[in-house]
């Protein structure tokens, strides 16, 4: 656990890595944590006020040098589906 001085410092610490599989935020303000995770955290997964194993119902995967793509959950199933575009003249 690394203590940050403010939100900007927390995001600098969290994103200062070439990897981006997952991270976590521990705080009493869960609404703020959700905003930070959604808008500023550069990882594929973020846990708020917890750490643990991956949930098979949630997408699992990272960004940056941790790779791209997702496993598990609905997003994981899309890795095994080929989308086809079919065009009709209007």
PLM features per residue range, with description:
Residues 1-90:
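Conserved C-terminal structural/oligomerization subdomain of aldehyde/semialdehyde dehydrogenase
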């Amino acid at each position: 656990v690394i203590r940050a001085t403010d939100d900007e410092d927390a995001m600098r610490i969290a994103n200062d890595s070439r990897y981006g599989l997952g991270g976590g935020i521990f705080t009493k303000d869960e609404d703020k944590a959700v905003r930070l995770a959604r808008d500023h955290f550069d990882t594929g997964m973020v846990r708020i006020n917890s750490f643990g194993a991956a949930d098979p119902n949630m997408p699992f995967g990272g960004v940056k040098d941790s790779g791209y793509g997702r496993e598990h959950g609905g997003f994981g199933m899309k890795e095994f589906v080929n989308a086809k575009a079919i065009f009709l003249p209007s």
